[in-house]
Amino acid sequence: MGKGLALDIGGTKIAAAVVTESGMLIGRQQIATPRGGAGQLAAALETLIAPYRHQVDFIAVASTGIISGGRLTALNPANLGGLADFPLYDCIRSISDLPCVLLNDGQAAAWAEYQALGDKNDNMMFVTVSTGVGGGIILNKKLLVGQRGLAGHIGHTLSDPHGVLCGCGRRGCVESVASGTAIGAETLGWKQPVSAATVFDMAQQGDAQAGKVINRSAAAIAQMLADMKMALDLEVVILGGSVGLAVGYLERVVAAQKTLPGIYRVPVQEAHHRQDSGLLGAALWARASL
């Protein structure tokens, strides 16, 4: 298939890179995800795609949300600035006139990380903790996509039935407790509210209040992993996303796991491809699909 242009559409940023036949990323760049609606998202995609449309053979897209029938539907529209539905496939085809393959970002990252593991595992899961919480599942060596693209939306499993209302409309989802957005929201009652990134900086400096907020997030992830271990007999979990890859977060998740009986624990490790799992996974999936 030659070279492809991979895009990773997230709640905070849109990343892009050319992916060679050998899997090397070239010219990686990223821009902030626009918050103004469909027109702004289309313009952002054109900015990233247009310079490459005569240099690549296909477009591969990993995107937050539900990817089905060529459309992007946000389970939690707040993660995309309120955008609930977008004709992603038609938009990209109109810009590039190139073959295009779409996949949810968690599913794409899971596919890339599964390849990086080699042939050692049949059942694994990728978890991204970032603006939201998402994931992708490999079961019996196959990526679960689902009939409607919903497979792997683990951030919308239940964490606290009495918790805050999630942007999806359900109360107490894992995303509403553990995401970077939730971490930032936890500080709204502080004398000086701060971002999730600042909470991590404060925790690194020994701030107990900040550490407590991060521990709450890590505990919610550990409990969700326990549920997924029992449902899917997972052998390993790969952790990614800006929160998931933050210094010390993995260790907090592992510490929270240790409070559970052994049968509920599953080995967890950081993403091999770091922040590029979605880009590479989308390209790998596209090559296998076209």
UniProtKB/Swiss-Prot annotation:
Q: Which CDD domains match?
A: ASKHA_NBD_ROK_EcNanK-like
Q: Which InterPro entries match?
A: ATPase_NBD, ManNAc_kinase_bac, ROK, ROK_cs
Q: What class of enzyme is it?
A: transferase
User: Transmembrane region positions?
Assistant: none
What Enzyme Commission number(s) appear in the record?
Answer: 2.7.1.60
Reactions catalysed, as given in the entry:
an N-acyl-D-mannosamine + ATP = an N-acyl-D-mannosamine 6-phosphate + ADP + H(+)
Instruction: Please indicate if the UniProt record lists Cell wall biogenesis/degradation as a keyword.
Output: no
One matching Pfam family, short form? ROK
The answer on whether this UniProt entry bears the keyword Isomerase reads no
GO-annotated molecular function: ATP binding; N-acylmannosamine kinase activity; zinc ion binding
Positions contributing to Zn(2+) binding: 156, 166, 168, 173
* Superkingdom field: Bacteria
Instruction: Print the keywords alphabetically.
Output: ATP-binding, Carbohydrate metabolism, Kinase, Metal-binding, Nucleotide-binding, Transferase, Zinc
Please name the GO terms of the biological process aspect recorded for this protein, alphabetically: N-acetylneuraminate catabolic process
| Ligand binding (ATP) | 6-13, 132-139
Q: According to its UniProt record, in which pathway does this protein act?
A: Amino-sugar metabolism; N-acetylneuraminate degradation; D-fructose 6-phosphate from N-acetylneuraminate: step 2/5
What this chain does, per the entry, is described as: Catalyzes the phosphorylation of N-acetylmannosamine (ManNAc) to ManNAc-6-P.
Q: What family is it from?
A: Belongs to the ROK (NagC/XylR) family. NanK subfamily.
Assembly description:
Homodimer.
Protein name in the entry: N-acetylmannosamine kinase
Gene that codes for this?
nanK
